[in-house]
Amino acid sequence: MPMNCLNCKAAVEPGLDFCPYCGFDLRVQRKCMSLSNMYYNLGLDKAQIRDLSGAIDMLRRSLKFNKLNIQARNLLGLVYFETGEAVSALSEWIISKNIMPENNVASEYIAKLQAEPAKLNMINQTIKKYNAALKCCRENNEDVAAIQLKKILSQNPKLIKGYHLLALVYIRREEYERARKILKKAARIDKTNSTTLRFLKEVDFQ
């Protein structure tokens, strides 16, 4: 099956070591594409068992080796969406659609999000409010941060980093049972998130 040279975009016949048009080393390209597909499959496996942070890591690696890997980019968008990062998800799908405008499931994902502009705006606002809560924590204004984070998580209950920050506030207050409950909710979204597990270990140690 012919492939396109990544350097000059020309269609080249299979089996060639170098692009006949620009001289690009196609062996390197094939190796990169193979590694990209390998990391995509690892990312897919992790996503299926809700190891979402692990999936994000694998899918980013996949795209590092082949930024044109549409399946990896679309799945990365889905995983971002599952962690409450709808804006990051939309960004990946828009890039995907720009790379492959036709017959791309990313178009459906974008349409579904854009069909609910109020919901998308609300999720976007929760990200901004999260950043404000983070600033409050850095300024030792944790009471205000906790109130904001509870509101954020009621509006965007998939936002993993929101659970982490609220749990950290509780840990600093030595309210370990509250922290444990919040971290358990985070673990239901992303089972093997390293931050969740590290915080749970700290809570259990108390």
List where the protein language model places each region.
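Canonical positions in the second alpha-helix
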Residues: 62, 95-96, 152, 185-186
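TPR-adjacent "capping" and linker segments in tetratricopeptide-repeat scaffold/adaptor proteins
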Residues: 24-38, 113-128
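Register position in tetratricopeptide repeats
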Residues: 48-49, 82-83, 99, 115-119, ...
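Helix-start (N-cap) detector for alpha-helical repeat units in TPR-like alpha-solenoids
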Residues: 33-37, 70-71, 104-105, 126, ...
